[in-house]
Amino acid sequence: MSERLSEISRHMRELRDAIELHNIRYYELDTPTIPDADFDKLFRELEELEQRHPELITPDSPTQRVGIPPLKAFPQVVHRTPMLSLSNAFTEGEVEAFDRRVRQSLGIAQVEYAVEPKFDGLAISLCYENGMLVSGATRGDGYIGEDVTLNLKTIRSIPLGLRAGDGSAEVPAFLEVRGEVLMLKADFERLNRQQREKNEKTFINPRNAAAGSLRQLDPCITANRNLRFFAYGIGVCEGGNVPHDTHSHLLDYLSSLRFPVMRERRTVTGVAGLLEYHHEINGLREQLSYDIDGTVYKVNELEYQEKLGFVSRAPRFALAHKFPAQEATTELLGIDVQVGRTGALTPVARLKPVFVGGATVTNATLHNEDEIRRKDVMIGDRVTVRRAGDVIPEVVAVQKESRPSNAKPFVMPEHCPVCGSRTIRLPGETLTRCTGGLFCPAQRKQAILHFASRRAMNIHGLGDKLVDHLVDNAIIRTPADLYKLGLAALAALDRMGEKSAGNIINEIEKSKDTTLARFIYSLGIRNVGEATARDLARYFGGLDRLMDADVETLQQVSDVGPVVAQSIADFFGERHNREVVEQLRAAGIRWKEGAGTQTTDHAAGSAHPGAAAASSKIAGRSFVLTGTLPTMSREEAREKIEAMGGKVAGSVSKKTDYVVAGADAGSKYDKALELGVALLDEAELIRLLQASQADNSSTHVDPERMV
C-alpha cells in the first residue's frame, strides 16, 4: 500500500470511529454533542472516500449499516424485512440527479412521486396479528431493533387493535406498520420546563426528548411524556385487501385503519413538482406543531419501487431532501449584555460567524444568568447554535470536551452597561435588572410612555410614534423633559402641526395637577402597580417620607412584602432616579400631601400624616362603584374616595359600606339591595366628600381640590 493510500486509510478509520462515537451519543445516550449537519458532513466524507477507494471499505463501516446495535436493556427483535434509512440530498442538483436516475432506470419520461414532510423523530415498527398489536420495536441497526412494546402501548395515537373506519378495509392476518414516534414542540417545551423545575436534565430538541422518553425502562414515565405516532409505510403484510398499486393508496389504507398519517402528503409529477413541494413545506415549517428536517420523495407506483430495488443501506426509489441545517457549531468569542426596554439585562453570545438556518449568525441569546450556569457556558467554548425560522438564534449546548484551557466564566455586571446604575436580581426572579428606570437610555421610551399613560399622568396624545420621534431626535431624555417642551419644537416634527402641538402642550400642563398615588405609579417602579401605589400614598402621605423609607418600614404597608419593598428601596436608592423626581417636582407637578396613615413622633412636634384621613367620614370605609355617573368617571370617583382614606373594592360583600350607583347599574346594584348595603348616587357621594373635606380643615392640612 502506498504512503498516500495509507494516509487515506488512516483518515477513513478516524472518520468511522468518530461516526460510531456520535452514533452512540445520539441513539443510546440521547446526548448528541454535534448538530445533525456536522454528522452528515462526516458521513458524506466517508461515503465519498469509500466510493473512490472501494478496496478500503470495512464490514463494520457505518455506511454498511443503518443505525447502531440496540440497547442491552431491551430484548432484541429481528426485523422480518430490513428497516433501511434513506439517501440524503442537500441541493436541488442532487434532487435532479435522483429524478434522472429513476427515469433512466425505468425508461420513462416522467415519474409520479408521493411526497411528505420528513419527521425528525424515531423510526419504529408495529406488528399486528389478527388485528391485535403484539410487538413494537425501534429501527436499531436496520436489521435488529429494541423491543419497546410496553412503552409503545402507552402512546395513545397507536391503535392497540385494528378495525376499519369505514368498514371497507379488511384487517390482514399479519401487518407490520412502520412510522415515526415524535414529541410535539409544545410538549417538548412543557417537558423541559418541568425538568428544570425538578433540577433534572433537559433535552436539546424534541427528537432527543422523544428518543429518551421511548427508551425508559419504566413505561409509566413514557406514558407521561405525551409522545405521538405517525405511520408512513408498511413492512410485511399477509392477507387483507391492502392496496398493491401506489404508495399514496397504502397511506389511505392505513388512515382507514385509524393510523395517524401526515396531512401534508400529496403526489407530484417530475422534478419541478418535487422542488415546488420542498419550498412550500419549508415555508410552513415553523407553523407545524412538530419538528421536520426535510421532505421525503418516494416513487408512487409500487411496481416501479420493486423494479428499482435497494442499495446496501437505502432504497433506490426514495430520497430525503434535507432543509438547511438549523444547528451548527462555532466558537463563542465573548458575552455582551443588552438592556431591554423594561431594564432587563440579557446576556448575548458573540460568535464566530456561522451559517445556520439559511443565514449567517454572529450573535445568539443566552437568555439569563441561570441558563448560562445550567449549560455551563464559558467564553472561548465551542457551542451549538440553533436558528429556526424567525426565532432568535440561541446557544443550546456546549461541547465541553473541546473546552480550551483559557476559557473564562461569565459574571453578570453589577452596574448597567448602558447608564452605570446598579443592577439587582430580586429573590425568585431569573432576570437581572437595571435600577435606573427613569434615567437609563435603554429604558427611555418605555419609561416615558408609562409615565404618560392614562392611569399614570394621563397625558392624552403622547403615543408611541410621538415618543419615538422625541427620543430618537434627542428632544427628550427623561419624563421631566416633557415639561420643558416648547410649542415650536413640537410643531417642527413630521406630521405635527401647530394646533396638534398646542393640544399636547396643554395636556402636559394639565397633568401637573395629579394625586400622589398616580405620581408614584407613573415612576414605573418594578412590582408597584396601581393598587400598591395607592396603598403607599395612603400610608406615607408624602413623597419625601416614601423616598426615605427603608425596607423594614415599607413592609408595614398593606400587601407590601420583601420583594416589593426591595424594589421600591432600590429605585429610590439610585441617585439618577431621585434627580429625575426632583426635576419633575421643580417642573410644577403637585398633589395633596398629608393623607397618609403612618404614625409619627408627635412629641417632636411633627404633623400626623394621617390626620386628614383619621377625621374623615370616608376614612376606612369600603365603597363599590357601578354604572355610569353623570359628571364623574369611575376612575375620578375612585381617586376622590381614596384621597379621603376610603377603599374601593371590585365586588359587593357584607363588608361593603356604600355602593355608588349610576345609570345602567348591574348585578352589583342588585347585590347591594340583597345585602342591605347603603346606596348612593353621585350627588350623595359629592356631599359625603364635601362633609369629609370640611372635617379635615380642622387638622390644618391643606388638601388641594377635593371635588
Curated annotation (Swiss-Prot):
Signal peptide: none annotated. PROSITE patterns: BRCT (PS50172), DNA_LIGASE_N1 (PS01055), DNA_LIGASE_N2 (PS01056). It catalyses: NAD(+) + (deoxyribonucleotide)n-3'-hydroxyl + 5'-phospho-(deoxyribonucleotide)m = (deoxyribonucleotide)n+m + AMP + beta-nicotinamide D-nucleotide. SUPFAM superfamilies: BRCT domain, DNA ligase/mRNA capping enzyme, catalytic domain, Nucleic acid-binding proteins, RuvA domain 2-like. Its EC number is 6.5.1.2. Keywords: DNA damage, DNA repair, DNA replication, Ligase, Magnesium, Manganese, Metal-binding, NAD, Zinc. Its cofactor is Mg(2+); Mn(2+). The active site is at residue 118. Zn(2+) binds at residues 416, 419, 434, 440. GO terms for biological process: DNA repair; DNA replication. It is an enzyme of class 6 (ligase). It holds the Pfam family BRCT. Residues 613-707 form the BRCT domain. Coiled coil: none annotated. InterPro entries: BRCT_dom (IPR001357), BRCT_dom_sf (IPR036420), DisA/LigA_HHH (IPR041663), DNA_ligase (IPR001679), DNA_ligase_AS (IPR018239), DNA_ligase_CS (IPR033136), DNAligase_adenylation (IPR013839), DNAligase_N (IPR013840). NAD(+) binds at residues 36-40, 85-86, 116, 139, 180, 298, 322. GO terms for molecular function: DNA binding; DNA ligase (NAD+) activity; metal ion binding. DNA ligase that catalyzes the formation of phosphodiester linkages between 5'-phosphoryl and 3'-hydroxyl groups in double-stranded DNA using NAD as a coenzyme and as the energy source for the reaction. It is essential for DNA replication and repair of damaged DNA. Belongs to the NAD-dependent DNA ligase family. LigA subfamily. This is DNA ligase. It comes from Nitrosospira multiformis (strain ATCC 25196 / NCIMB 11849 / C 71).
